[in-house]
């Protein structure tokens, strides 16, 4: 885990993110074929999965997105992942794809799309599920339900994918770094790294995205001034000028939207 003390559940570290090629039909085309009433404001999905508890009386996840997101060119009903049928664990035979938003909006094992005249109120759309306080809140303070907002576009974030944390590096050898960055509905305009705990930053080479909602690859190399313990921090900035914070951002009940700078440890010898 990258948290201390570690959170419960799967310790995915940096393994809970990927960028895939999806093939399908635009959700917009399907909805327009069926007809969209002027009163439509949201879509919701129902799927073939069951509640994690196995209790048939409990509703499984049923989330949704506003119509403006549902009608984007990139929002799909997908049947292929990286050129092959979607694997069962990823939602075969059909999956909703709402890129740039929480993955829970991209429902697996899709069997029904609802067009709603109100915000969808399915399972995991209310309470603290995928919702955060609308205004900054002191840690642990109660938040009225009316003051909780549904998470939409994900914040700017980057990862160092090479090397792994904890390596040894010889002082005389430059260290190659690389990773990925993304910014929800926005694009990434810059990535920088620091080896002195944020006192100074070195700009990285940033590759363009293959499309509007795909992640971007970055790379650079660093040299160290002396032997000892170092941390490498990565910080991305989006096209609206927002950068990753160096500490965990504002508190929320479930710990969502933590886009603090990723960091790795290096022992220079």
Predicted regions and their residues:
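Structured, non-membrane catalytic/scaffold regions adjacent to prosthetic-group chemistry
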Residues: 1-269
């Amino acid at each position: 885990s990258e948290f201390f003390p570690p959170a419960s559940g799967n310790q995915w570290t940096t393994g809970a993110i990927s960028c895939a090629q999806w093939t399908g039909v635009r959700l917009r085309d399907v909805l327009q074929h069926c007809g969209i009433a002027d009163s439509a404001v949201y879509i919701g999905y129902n799927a073939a999965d069951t509640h994690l508890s196995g209790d048939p009386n409990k509703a499984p996840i049923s989330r949704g997105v506003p119509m403006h997101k549902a009608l984007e060119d990139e929002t799909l009903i997908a049947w292929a992942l990286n050129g092959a049928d979607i694997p069962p664990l990823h939602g075969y035979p059909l999956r909703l794809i709402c890129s740039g938003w929480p993955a829970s909006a991209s429902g697996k094992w899709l069997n029904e799309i609802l067009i709603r005249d109100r915000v969808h109120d399915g399972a995991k759309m209310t309470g603290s599920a995928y919702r955060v306080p609308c205004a900054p809140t002191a840690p642990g303070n109660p938040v009225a339900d009316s003051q909780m907002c549904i998470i939409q576009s994900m914040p700017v974030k980057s990862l160092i994918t090479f090397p792994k944390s904890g390596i040894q590096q010889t002082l005389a050898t430059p260290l190659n770094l690389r990773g990925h960055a993304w910014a929800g509905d926005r694009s990434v305009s810059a990535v920088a790294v620091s080896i002195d705990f944020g006192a100074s930053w070195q700009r990285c080479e940033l590759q363009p995205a293959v499309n509007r909602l795909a992640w971007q690859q970055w790379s650079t190399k660093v040299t160290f001034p002396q032997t000892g313990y170092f941390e490498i921090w990565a910080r991305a900035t989006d096209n609206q000028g927002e950068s990753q914070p160096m500490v965990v951002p504002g508190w929320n009940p479930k710990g969502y939207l933590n886009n603090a700078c990723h960091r790795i440890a290096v022992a220079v010898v």
